[in-house]
């Protein structure tokens, strides 16, 4: 079956439209991917910040206990 020039032109127009749509979708994908990457970096930063604060909290609790222990030991020494 041979195609007429009109049919070939119509098919080429459809191909062109599909190519334009494909390019738009590719650009949209790249944009969404970059947004996702940015959000992932933000989440990683926040997770690290939470860990840091949790570790800091643990250290502060330990320091407070040590201070109390030293204060108690100091009181015992003063009472001697």
UniProtKB/Swiss-Prot annotation:
Keywords: Plasmid. It comes from the Archaea. This is Uncharacterized protein ORF7'. It comes from Methanothermobacter thermautotrophicus.
